[in-house]
Amino acid sequence: MESAAFKAARSPQDFLPLTPLSFLVLMVLADRDSHGYGIIKEVERRTDGSTRPGTGTLYTALQRLTDDDLIQEAEQRPDIGDDSRRRYYSLTALGRQTAQLEAERMANLVGLAIDSDLLPHTAGSSHGES
């Protein structure tokens, strides 16, 4: 078990690279608090169905993200009329910083892939223009 002092000293870089599912969860929670099923549906929507996390996989990721203080159980329920058994999650400040660093890391990798002609050229790119 980690001491509170060790956990408090952790920085966003300590969690990089994130797993794809962890990054997707943090992105969903960056927009709004959500419960597990809502996170699953939003991940499916954002990835056009290419990522469909199973409930066991998602809840394992949620537990790990909670243990790492990247997310927490939300203090308030966004929908008061919702099923009281649902646990809502929210992004912590550390979670937001970690997601931002991961996005920057991935953007740099995509830039390298474009430079290596591994991705189609994007509009406005200087590659291939005459």
Set out the residue ranges of the language-model regions.
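Amphipathic alpha-helical dimerization/coiled-coil segments
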Residues: E2, L94-S130
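Basic amphipathic alpha-helical segments that dock to polyanions
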Residues: L58-L65
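N-terminal helix-turn-helix DNA-binding core of bacterial DNA-binding proteins
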Residues: Q13-T57
